[in-house]
């Protein structure tokens, strides 16, 4: 059942029935709120019998004892108080949400003895609850035998904390982050028959309501600009491509923007170099990079970030009809460099190279960061727990690595070098679009590097993290929204005036 939380922050609250969630750190004698919900003092014995010690994400769920104003009590562990991070508070909120699926109302006692609970921690806890509750089920006509399509469960949650004012302020900000993550998840989860390039562009245009300037380049306009690489990918589909440019002008007029570029292949059959049938349905998510960029632009605008930012997404469909490009074709990119197409399933880099060149040529950004579900090779190297980071700039790379650690959207830096560059030299053109099996994610990044000049640039290969990654306390969705929180943290920590 779709679930939504309505939050209230309060310094004190006496439950009138419902569930009470009491947080406790490892080693503490008692949890938060015990004086309110356990007047008879039975919780210590229950915790002992249930072997609950406050270990991170551990829980004990009991019927409320006689005399309690609550109907149900959930003890939830926070772990080591000294080591708590923002991500830990998110996970704790997600764990609480998972326990409250059958609840109608709940009281969360946040101020566990032994831990300094800030307003940001309270807000992160609430965001974690929302992230856990996200579900994409709009195409299910019935969720269960006794449930109509329109049913949505609303759980009223009171979060009890001494930092009410700070929590409310922080939650207003983190809610915008949640909205951006959910937008990215929605876009990745949407089926390709519903979300083509034109429809995706229309979704991006809705950001104008938040003050984002949005323009959409048509196929004709891209032809005039000479985007032969991007258009070559699109020519096998009856659905026309689009290039969407989103601008958020929250900084000083003279400041150069920070640029984010996303691969938006709304469905990838592989083209003439067609993919195997098994698992091909997941290629509706091959626009995870574009989804993350769109979600990020939503966040920056919604929270009125004091930065100038540009988001550019190249939207195409890679199909194998009679007009599709062939292995051996040579296309001319916007940069004037020619590319021999060895494998039509190495199409994302063809989309990105024109988008990167266009961005650099038009906006002269202070830095460019692209996101793409680019290679299966990165999944071989890193599985789906880290995204690959490639960069020509150590400072930018370190900023991204730190942001990844903070948000737990983790990155692992991969190499670039002349040796890899030689692997994409072509006998017939300036370069070829794949260097073969060995070092596949590296040669893909090396290809993109040829289109960024000397601008500080980073490439995030999110093929293993944007979709189908393992579920956890804050993500129960196939499409994860990976990259939105990471890049918002990057902006917040390094680029806002």
Swiss-Prot record:
It comes from the Bacteria. GO terms for molecular function: manganese ion binding; metalloaminopeptidase activity. The active site is at residues 275, 349. It is an enzyme of class 3 (hydrolase). It is found in: Cytoplasm. GO terms for cellular component: cytoplasm. Mn(2+) 2 binds at residues 263, 268, 286, 347. Binds 2 manganese ions per subunit. Its EC number is 3.4.11.1, 3.4.11.10. Pfam families: Peptidase_M17, Peptidase_M17_N. It catalyses: Release of an N-terminal amino acid, Xaa-|-Yaa-, in which Xaa is preferably Leu, but may be other amino acids including Pro although not Arg or Lys, and Yaa may be Pro. Amino acid amides and methyl esters are also readily hydrolyzed, but rates on arylamides are exceedingly low; Release of an N-terminal amino acid, preferentially leucine, but not glutamic or aspartic acids. Its cofactor is Mn(2+). Disulfide bonds: none annotated. Mn(2+) 1 binds at residues 268, 345, 347. Its main location: cytoplasm. Keywords: Aminopeptidase, Cytoplasm, Hydrolase, Manganese, Metal-binding, Protease. GO terms for biological process: proteolysis. Belongs to the peptidase M17 family. Presumably involved in the processing and regular turnover of intracellular proteins. Catalyzes the removal of unsubstituted N-terminal amino acids from various peptides. This is Probable cytosol aminopeptidase.
């Amino acid at each position: 059942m779709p679930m939504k939380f309505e939050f209230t922050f309060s310094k004190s609250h006496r439950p009138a029935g419902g569930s009470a969630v009491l947080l406790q750190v490892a080693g503490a004698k008692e949890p938060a709120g015990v004086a309110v919900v356990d007047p008879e003092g039975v919780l210590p014995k229950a915790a002992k019998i249930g072997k609950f010690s406050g270990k991170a994400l551990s829980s004990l769920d009991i019927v409320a004892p006689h005399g309690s104003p609550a109907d149900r009590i959930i003890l939830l562990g926070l772990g080591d108080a000294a080591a708590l991070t923002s991500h830990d508070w998110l996970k704790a909120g997600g764990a609480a949400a998972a326990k409250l699926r059958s609840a109608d109302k709940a009281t969360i006692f946040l101020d566990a003895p032994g831990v300094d609970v800030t307003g940001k921690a309270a807000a992160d806890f609430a965001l974690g609850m929302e992230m856990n509750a996200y579900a994409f089920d709009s195409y299910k006509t019935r969720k269960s035998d006794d449930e109509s399509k329109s049913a949505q469960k609303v759980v009223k949650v009171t979060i009890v904390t001494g930092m009410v004012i700070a929590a409310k302020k922080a939650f207003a900000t983190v809610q915008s982050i949640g909205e951006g993550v959910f937008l990215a998840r929605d876009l990745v989860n949407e089926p390709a028959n519903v979300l083509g390039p034109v429809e995706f562009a229309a979704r991006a245009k809705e950001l104008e309501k938040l003050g984002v300037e949005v323009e959409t380049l048509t196929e004709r306009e891209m032809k005039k600009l000479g985007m032969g690489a991007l258009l070559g990918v699109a020519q096998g589909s009856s659905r026309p491509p689009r290039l969407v440019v989103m601008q958020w002008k929250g900084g000083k007029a003279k400041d150069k923007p920070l640029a984010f570029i996303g691969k938006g292949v709304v469905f990838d059959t592989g083209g003439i170099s067609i993919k195997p049938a098994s698992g091909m349905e997941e290629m509706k998510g091959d626009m995870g990079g574009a989804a993350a960029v769109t979600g990020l632009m939503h966040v920056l605008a919604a929270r009125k970030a004091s930065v100038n930012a540009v988001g550019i997404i190249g939207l195409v469909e890679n199909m194998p009809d009679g007009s599709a490009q062939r292995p051996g074709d040579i296309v001319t990119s916007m940069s004037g460099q020619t590319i021999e197409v060895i494998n039509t399933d190495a199409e994302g880099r063809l989309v990105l190279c024109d988008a990167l060149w266009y961005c650099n040529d038009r906006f002269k950004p202070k830095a460019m960061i692209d996101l793409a579900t680019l290679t299966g090779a990165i999944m071989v190297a890193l599985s789906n727990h880290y995204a690959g980071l490639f960069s020509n700039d150590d400072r930018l790379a370190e900023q991204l690595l730190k942001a990844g650690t903070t948000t737990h959207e983790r990155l692992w830096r991969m190499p670039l070098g002349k040796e890899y560059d030689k692997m994409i030299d072509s006998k017939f053109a300036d370069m070829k679009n794949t260097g073969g099996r060995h070092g596949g994610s590296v040669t893909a990044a090396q290809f993109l590097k040829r289109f960024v000049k000397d601008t500080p640039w980073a490439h995030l290969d999110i093929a293993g993290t944007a979709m189908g990654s393992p579920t956890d306390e804050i993500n129960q969705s196939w499409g994860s929204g990976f990259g939105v929180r990471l890049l918002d943290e990057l902006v917040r920590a390094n680029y806002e005036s």
